[in-house]
Every structure is written in structure tokens, then in C-alpha cells.
Amino acid sequence: MCDVVLGSQWGDEGKGKLVDLLCDDIDVCARCQGGNNAGHTIVVGKVKYDFHMLPSGLVNPKCQNLVGSGVVIHVPSFFAELENLEAKGLDCRDRLFVSSRAHLVFDFHQRTDKLKEAELSTNKKSIGTTGKGIGPTYSTKASRSGIRVHHLVNPDPEAWEEFKTRYLRLVESRQKRYGEFEYDPKEELARFEKYRETLRPFVVDSVNFMHEAIAANKKILVEGANALMLDIDFGTYPYVTSSSTGIGGVLTGLGIPPRTIRNVYGVVKAYTTRVGEGPFPTEQLNKVGETLQDVGAEYGVTTGRKRRCGWLDLVVLKYSNSINGYTSLNITKLDVLDKFKEIEVGVAYKLNGKELPSFPEDLIDLAKVEVVYKKFPGWEQDITGIKKYEDLPENAKNYLKFIEDYLQVPIQWVGTGPARDSMLEKKI
């Protein structure tokens, strides 16, 4: 059976820390979607490991790790991340596998990603992309012109000729769209001819890999990237990523049936953050937002960009839960709220004076909503490193209880500090 960790807001909730905790007792860790456009750091002992594309289960020496079919892979970044982990003493090459059906990200995808973003910014319609080529790769995938891993690693000489033809056709189409941008396709093809050999040992039929693991009753953890509010279908479109970041992306990205899912863990930051553009109803463009940003060290691992900050939004979480069906929650970074005398939580939206029954799909409406807040007294004491739920201040427990009651989902873990072991587990 599979347990799944998903982001419930706009990303950066702290999913990696929960995955790290759960990885101690699993056999397989799988990434199902996204690429190297997200990131987190895991600390083991005194060593920091940075993850962007590779599964976090690599820190467990007994865990096999799969980059699934729904992931898009920039091969140079794949090897750079792997070599960075190995340089820090992590022996993981024999435990890492890549789906033969995953699509490849090329340098021209990254170039055109930045060109597209620059084009949009002139009309003040910038998405806030990371520039990693993720969107353009999913675009070529959807248009059936993309190139998959098996196209690259197939040892048949005819397959390599087909790869080159597909590649040059893609480059030509991009240059027709964006003009003759500075780019050397021959140089990239020469690199990929070498990657044919170096990537091949990692490649597996991921559908067979997953179903053999399920049949053997192995403990499987699926590591979602990004978060529900960035989902291509259910997020704040068009200010979203280009993949299915919810529970649907787990099934399609790994080729597993719904009945194999046991638990869906929703990771929730105790307040709300967002990177990039798009409406953000509970955003605080004031001292509150600045404090959350400074105390919470809200800067992206992948881009280094400052994150926009605001109060917890339960309208977002209710919507997120209705799609992903969380069996329990992990509330992260509760300690960031330690010094607030008063804490607010968004509990409803009003538009033109009327309360909305659900999260609006139209961003014109979302940008105009009035947030209805409920106020809570803060606990104004340091909770860093508290190990038992019972030892939390009463006001902190009241805050958490309100979240549980509103969402009708139990809280199973609470983050109480930045350290790896600063996570308490609550009986549910």
C-alpha cells in the first residue's frame, strides 16, 4: 500500500521534513510529478542534503527511489543533484531508478521558458515561473511532440537517429516561435549522446516497478511536489505549475490504481505563503507579513525568492481537502507564530457582501473577495522543540483544535522548530 505526502496550499509547506520522518520506515520512495522546480533541505546529523528532483528517500540506505513517469527530467540537473549528494557521502546510485516514460527537459525548454516569461512581463501577466523549463516540457508532452527517456536510452542505432530527428524538429519549432535565440543544438546533442550510456543503468519500466513493489507488500511513500493550489486544473490558474499536483497526479504519474492508496497526508503551514504572482486573499502587506517572512525565513530553496506571507486560510484548505481527501494533517512551523499577541485565521470569503459557498475559480472574483477572519489569542512563548502535544500552550492547542474542527481532519504531526527532530506526533 502507498502513503502519500501532498502540499495543501501554494507550496513550501515543509513536505520534505515529514517525508524525512516517514522515510526511516519505508521500502520505496517515489516522485510522481514536477521537476527540479521545487526544493527542500534535509539535515541528517550535521550534513545538509538539498533535494530538487530526486526522491528524499535516498537518505535511507535501505530505501529504493523512483523518479516516476509524471516527472520531467533535466538530465544535467539530475546528475548534478546526484553527484552533490554523493559528494556529501550519500551512497545512493544503486537505489535510484528513473521511469522510461518520463519526459526530458532540454536546455532550449529552459531558454524558451525565460523568453515566454519576459514576453508576459511586458504585458504585466508574468506567471512567476522558476525558468527551469518545466512548463514548456509539459507543453510539448501535451502536444505529443515531446521526447521521453526511452527514446534516449534505447541502444538500437535507429532509435538514436529518431531521437535526433525529434530533437531538431522541436528546436526548429521553438525557433520559429521565438526567433533565432542563442543556442547550440549540436553541442546539446553531443552531450545527450553521452547521456545515452550514463542514464541507461537507472532506467526502469516504472509501472512494473511499482506494481511489483505493491504485490510484495512493500511500504511505499509517494512524495508530492508543489501543492494543490498550484495544480494545473484545480489551482489558481493560470498562476500555477504545469502538472497535476494533487492526488490525481499521484495515480497518473506513477500508473497505480486508487485502491493502492492508504493514507493521504496533507502538509499545512501554520500560516500561508506564496511565491510568484496571483491573488492571495490573506496576504499581509504589513508588519505581520514582514514578521512571518523574517521569523519563518521565507526564501525559496530553488530560486532564493522572497515568499509572500499571510494568515492561515481555511477556505483554501477546505477546498484542498475536498480534492485530495486528507486522512490526517501535518501542521508545520507553528513556532513561527510564537511571538504574536493575536493570530487571525481566514474562515470565509465574501463577494459583494455575500458569503461564497466555496473557493472561487475566477481570479477576478478571488482578487476582490473580502476575507472573514476569526481572531485567536497568541501563546507568546517559545514552543521550539516541544515533543509532546500535551506540553503545548493552551492557546496553541486551541488554535490547532479549531483547524481540526473546521476541516474535519485530524492533525497527526506538529512542527515546533527548524531542527529535524522538532516534530511532535499527536495520537489520532
UniProtKB/Swiss-Prot annotation:
Location within or outside the cell: Cytoplasm
Residues involved in GTP binding: 11-17, 39-41, 307, 333-335, 415-417
GO biological process, one term: IMP metabolic process
Binding site for Mg(2+): D12, G39
Chain coiled-coil ranges: none
Annotated Gene Ontology cellular component terms: cytoplasm
Residues binding substrate: V301, T302, T303, G304, R305, K306, R307
Keyword GTP-binding included in the entry's annotation: yes
Entry GO MF terms: adenylosuccinate synthase activity; GTP binding; magnesium ion binding
Manner of cofactor binding, per the entry note: Binds 1 Mg(2+) ion per subunit.
Active site: D12, H40
Catalytic activity: IMP + L-aspartate + GTP = N(6)-(1,2-dicarboxyethyl)-AMP + GDP + phosphate + 2 H(+)
Major location category of this protein: cytoplasm
SUPFAM superfamilies named in the record: P-loop containing nucleoside triphosphate hydrolases (SSF52540)
Biochemical pathway: Purine metabolism; AMP biosynthesis via de novo pathway; AMP from IMP: step 1/2
UniProt cross-references to PANTHER family, sorted A to Z: ADENYLOSUCCINATE SYNTHETASE
Quaternary structure and partners: Homodimer.
Family: Belongs to the adenylosuccinate synthetase family.
Role description: Plays an important role in the de novo pathway and in the salvage pathway of purine nucleotide biosynthesis. Catalyzes the first committed step in the biosynthesis of AMP from IMP.
Name of protein: Adenylosuccinate synthetase
Record organism: Candida albicans (strain SC5314 / ATCC MYA-2876) (Yeast)
